[in-house]
Amino acid sequence: MPLLDSFKVDHTKMQAPAVRIAKTMTTPKGDLITVFDLRFCVPNKEIMSPKGIHTLEHLFAGFMRAHLNSDEVEIIDISPMGCRTGFYMSLIGAPSERRVADAWLAAMHDILNVQDQSKIPELNIYQCGTYTEHSLSDAHATAQHVITRGIGINKNEELLLDESLLTE
């Protein structure tokens, strides 16, 4: 099986919270797609709770769209990483890492303003596969963690994993 791009960066060097351009590609029609690594937690040292990351998933996507979508940028998807240290965001366009970081920070403030679990979007048996598995307090703790630390930028050239360490 081919080695995925996300496994070609040294996770021991990643800063968090931080934005990284994980991948760019151009569609056959010429649209630029950018995939961002939005790293909330330091890999192998910190982790988001399952209920907290699930709640963030419901809140973060809408708030990021409100702060980042424009005539030049349209978010396709924001999905949690299986390792629970961040989210991947795929979008049409090529906003700068700083613009993404600013939108992310604004979204974290928005999350802190959600004061009741009943205000979490799509939190019901019809629209959520595990609608009882949420924690607004865990989502608040993660949002506060990001705000307190600030959001940096991870550069691929600084994280490139030495080829001797690559295993498939």
UniProtKB/Swiss-Prot annotation:
EC numbers on record: 4.4.1.21
Binding site for Fe cation: H54, H58, C128
Matches recorded under Gene3D superfamilies: S-ribosylhomocysteinase (LuxS)
Assembly mode: Homodimer.
Official protein name in the record: S-ribosylhomocysteine lyase
Homology family: Belongs to the LuxS family.
Domain of life: Bacteria
GO biological process, one term: quorum sensing
Obligatory cofactor(s): Fe cation
Cofactor stoichiometry and binding remark: Binds 1 Fe cation per subunit.
Top-tier EC class: lyase
GO molecular function: iron ion binding; S-ribosylhomocysteine lyase activity
Protein keywords: Autoinducer synthesis, Iron, Lyase, Metal-binding, Quorum sensing
HAMAP family given in the database record: LuxS
